[in-house]
Amino acid sequence: MEKMVMKMLVIFVFGMNHWTCTGFPVYDYDPASLKEALSASVAKVNSQSLSPYLFRAFRSSIKRVNALDEDSLTMDLEFRIQETTCRRESEADPATCDFQRGYHVPVAVCRSTVRMSAERVQDVWVRCHWSSSSGSSSSEEMFFGDILGSSTSRNSHLLGLTPDRSRGEPLYERSREMRRNFPLGNRRYSNPWPRARVNPGFE
């Protein structure tokens, strides 16, 4: 009987060590921190958006939590955003704004990494790409430069997204497809990419 108890204790201790070494989530973070991290991610998008409207997140999920020390961590989040009816100058909380409605209102899929210390946001990095009916792919992925443009000007500016230069050719083909689906209303902006400005300090 004693041998059986000792054997069970050894298995239990070994199993706990194994989970810790393989990244078993042992950090007990406050759910309020997750909400703050998501709000900071959306705020980062809205702060650099070209759109006159605020974006709001939905279908959010946490992908990973990395404990840096006993008081700091990073969170990897995935969420979707869509324009709301609230204008930027209103300074409203996007979470309280209604989504815009209509067939041509796009949805972007975003991933963010948020570094927190003492339960406060320190740094935020965000990367998004527009969703499509066929699903996302590497050729559709775009990185934030001047970020998201308004849905009212999406025809001429491809929503303000700046392409990843390493995938320039696939993105050019994608832009031609989007222009076929959403014909340009103003031919003066038929080639928006040379006008795009890249913000090197933001990913």
Curated annotation (Swiss-Prot):
GO terms for cellular component: extracellular region. It is found in: Secreted. Residues 1-23 form the signal peptide. Residues 164-174 have a biased composition (Basic and acidic residues). GO terms for biological process: bone remodeling. The keyword Secreted applies. It comes from the Eukaryota. Pfam families: Spp-24. Disulfide bonds join 86-97, 110-128. Residues 155-174 are annotated as: Disordered. Its main location: secreted. The modification Phosphoserine is found at residues 90, 138-139, 166, 175. Multiply phosphorylated at serine residues. Keywords: Disulfide bond, Phosphoprotein, Secreted, Signal. Could coordinate an aspect of bone turnover. Belongs to the SPP2 family. This is Secreted phosphoprotein 24. The gene is SPP2.
